Regions:
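Extended, charge-rich low-complexity interaction segments
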Residues: 37-41, 168-182
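Electropositive, gly/pro-rich neighborhoods at or near active sites that engage anionic ligands
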Residues: 1-135
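A short, acidic, amphipathic alpha-helical segment used as a generic capping/interface helix at domain edges
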Residues: 46-48, 161-175, 186
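Short Gly/Thr/Asp-enriched flexible loops that form oxyanion-binding sites at enzyme active sites
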Residues: 186-198
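Glycine-rich phosphate/diphosphate-binding loop of Rossmann-like nucleotide-binding domains
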Residues: 135-143
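Short, flexible loop segments at boundaries between secondary-structure elements
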Residues: 142-154, 197-220
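Glycine-rich phosphate-binding "P-loop"
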Residues: 79-86, 142-166
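Gly/Ser/Thr-rich loops at beta-strand to alpha-helix junctions
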Residues: 1, 68-71, 114-118, 180-189, ...
């Protein structure tokens, strides 16, 4: 989006990979709908989404990223406030003997995810999921069932932003200390919203379900 906004670059910058496509790529636009649940995937709505993401980037405290995209992060740094950058895998609490998730013990935790009911069922049998009990400690669990709008299913909302506002209202009904989020394109803006209301949020993305022992095809 930043490349589109800046316009056509010098050819050598594009060939070096210093800048991305400076036109609206139809494949990327369709992926936003089919993979991330954004709708409608037109220029007007996507531009609004991108501007919101740039504004919310300033609220990041810790940013996990794939090594393959770290080179391109310099483009976003002007919109950030010096967050700590870590490998994305560090968010997985089950890969270490001293998981970060141990701090959830005794807290009020709300999980925002399409698999809300399954996550509640899995948490009820958490003692069977991991040998290290600190991965999923004893806390007060609440869930908000995220809107699942992948593939163009609008779920009765007029657009993605309408669905986002509905989820913000649902979050406002919950009493919690920490919010764990995994819900496609909604995740990062919801995490920013949680911080704005004075609470803490961890935006996992798709990997959140693993924390509750729920596998998916991508991990087979």
């Amino acid at each position: 989006y930043l490349s589109i906004r800046q316009g056509k670059p010098l050819l050598k910058k594009y060939l070096r990979g210093d800048v991305s496509d400076w036109w609206w790529n139809k494949n990327v636009m369709n992926q936003m709908q089919n993979w991330s649940g954004f709708f409608p995937p037109d220029i007007e709505h996507l531009s609004r989404f991108c501007e919101m993401m740039l504004q919310d980037a300033s609220l990041l405290d810790i940013c996990g990223s794939f090594e393959t995209v770290q080179r391109g992060l310099h483009i976003l740094r002007p919109y950030m406030c010096n967050p700590l950058f870590i490998p994305l895998s560090f968010f997985d609490p089950f890969v270490t003997s001293r998981p970060w998730s141990r701090v959830l013990k005794g807290k009020k935790v709300v999980v925002i995810h399409p698999f809300a009911e399954l996550i509640e069922a899995q948490y009820a049998r958490r003692s069977d999921l991991f040998d290290n009990k600190d991965v999923l400690p004893d806390f007060e669990l609440r869930t908000v069932k995220a809107v699942q709008s992948l593939g163009g299913d609008n779920q009765g909302f007029k657009d993605w932003f309408d669905a986002l506002e509905w989820m913000k209202r649902e979050i406002g009904k919950a009493d919690f200390d920490i919010c764990l989020i995994g819900c496609g394109a909604y995740g990062f803006p919801l995490a920013a919203h949680v911080k704005k209301i004075g609470k803490q949020a961890v935006h996992f993305g798709g990997g959140l379900q693993l924390m509750f022992g729920i596998k998916g095809i991508r991990w087979k």
